[in-house]
């Protein structure tokens, strides 16, 4: 039986209805779902799970769109685990992470990466996203993936700079991608072409106006590899503070990170079951980062589990999820469901999970730190129970400065060097001048 991560205590009634309490926990080799209103205690349980997993040497990751959880978490890493840590602070302008999604992708993986990037942009722009924009972006990413020394910053240049486009297309062999650029894009009337690419240009321009995003995704060199982290029980902590870098950049980075971990899991198909080291990724405010439709996400959860990637999806309220189908797909595919205090609307959606033992009034009236939970046991659905989450773990190690310095050294580049290379790449081509003969 696997060793459980301790969460707190649960109410237990003996045969004569005498109330007692016993400890309860979760197996990290399960998907999980955590919901709770602001101030209900949700962040504390995520934090305690992460600290225990790190202390035990588990492969663990965290995507934090607020920033406080990630900043706090690195203070609990013992010195023996510092070599395992990749700490990614998107607001660290001095040392941007060297992360190039397009670098060294095998040909059979390139379509998956393309769809992941397109899905992240689609998720970000929602209602303002159009078919033609998606069509152009898909073919741009596919072309850049086939070429050497490219990054996502090359998309706009590919659209507007013919010499650069020619240098990229000379390396593309996929007939469908080549057909788009030569038989479609190049044949468009110049005015129509400008109208067609303008929405994508505007969206890219708004995103890459952020120095944080530009300096991370605009690097050609890649030092960040989710597959290596997963296979070696790494510790990945991503701080994506929306208040500092903006909603758009934070959501895009989170969506791309989630996509990359999903793709890294799928790459394990060629590895034997015994070599698929379990890795658990905890995602706070996960609706900001989802790129799949409901049916596709249900498949994603099943595939991830098969290849040793387990997700805990946490958020505040169900209105953040844009369809009941997606909500049901999640509830049907997770082993552990933990509900803190929720609104009346959310209680109506969740009471089927905990019925008949617990209903709407129970979910609405929980105190801070109280939960109603359903935990899978030995592969079978558990019986719902009321519990109390343990208080915050307090044993800080005090090595945050060392962890930040080590992650900068191993996974990042100095800002001045990054910006020098990006400036050189984006510099306009020199104008041709005629020689004047005297």
Where are the language model's segments positioned?
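P-loop NTPase motor core of the ASCE superfamily
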Residues: 2, 23, 123, 128-132, ...
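P-loop NTPase motor domains
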Residues: 2-17, 25-27, 32-40, 45-309, ...
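H-loop/switch region of ABC-family ATPase nucleotide-binding domains
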Residues: 315
């Amino acid at each position: 039986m696997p060793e459980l991560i301790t969460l707190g205590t649960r109410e237990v009634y003996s045969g004569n209805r005498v109330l007692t309490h016993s400890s309860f926990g979760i197996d990290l080799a399960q998907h999980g779902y955590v919901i709770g209103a602001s101030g209900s205690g949700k962040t504390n349980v995520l934090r305690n799970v992460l600290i225990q997993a790190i202390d035990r040497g588990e492969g663990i990751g965290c995507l934090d769109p607020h920033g406080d959880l990630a900043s706090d978490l690195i203070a609990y890493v013992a010195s023996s685990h510092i070599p395992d840590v990749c700490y990614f602070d998107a607001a660290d302008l001095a040392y941007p992470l060297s992360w190039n999604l397009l670098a060294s992708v095998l040909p059979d993986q390139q379509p998956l990466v393309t769809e992941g990037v397109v899905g992240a942009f689609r998720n970000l722009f929602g209602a303002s996203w159009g078919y033609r924009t998606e069509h152009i972006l898909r073919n741009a990413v596919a072309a850049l993936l086939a070429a050497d020394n490219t990054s996502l910053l090359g998309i706009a240049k590919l659209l507007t700079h013919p010499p650069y486009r020619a240098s990229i297309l000379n390396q593309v062999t996929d007939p469908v991608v080549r057909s788009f650029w030569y038989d479609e894009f190049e044949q468009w009337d110049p005015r129509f072409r400008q109208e067609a690419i303008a929405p994508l240009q505007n969206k890219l321009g708004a995103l890459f106006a952020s120095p944080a995003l530009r300096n991370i995704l605009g690097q050609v060199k890649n030092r960040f590899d989710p597959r290596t982290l997963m296979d070696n029980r790494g510790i990945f902590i991503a701080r994506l503070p929306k208040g500092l870098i903006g909603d758009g950049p934070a959501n895009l980075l989170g969506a791309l990170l989630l996509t990359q971990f999903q793709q890294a899991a799928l790459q394990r198909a060629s590895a034997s079951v015994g070599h698929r080291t379990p890795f658990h990724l905890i995602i706070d405010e996960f609706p900001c980062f989802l790129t799949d439709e409901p049916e596709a996400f249900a498949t994603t959860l099943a595939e991830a589990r098969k290849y040793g990637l387990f997700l805990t999806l946490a958020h505040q309220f169900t209105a953040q999820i844009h369809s009941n189908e997606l909500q049901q797909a999640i509830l049907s595919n997770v082993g552990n469901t933990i509900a803190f205090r929720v609104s009346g609307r959310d209680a109506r959606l969740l009471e089927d999970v905990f019925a008949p033992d617990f209903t709407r009034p129970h979910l609405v009236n929980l105190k801070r730190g109280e939960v109603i939970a359903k935990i899978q046991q030995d592969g079978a659905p558990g019986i719902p129970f009321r519990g109390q989450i343990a208080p915050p773990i307090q044993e800080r190690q005090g090595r945050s400065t060392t962890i930040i310095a080590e992650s900068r050294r191993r996974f990042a580049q100095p800002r001045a060097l990054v910006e020098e290379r990006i400036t050189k790449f984006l510099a306009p081509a020199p104008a041709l001048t005629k020689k004047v003969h005297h």
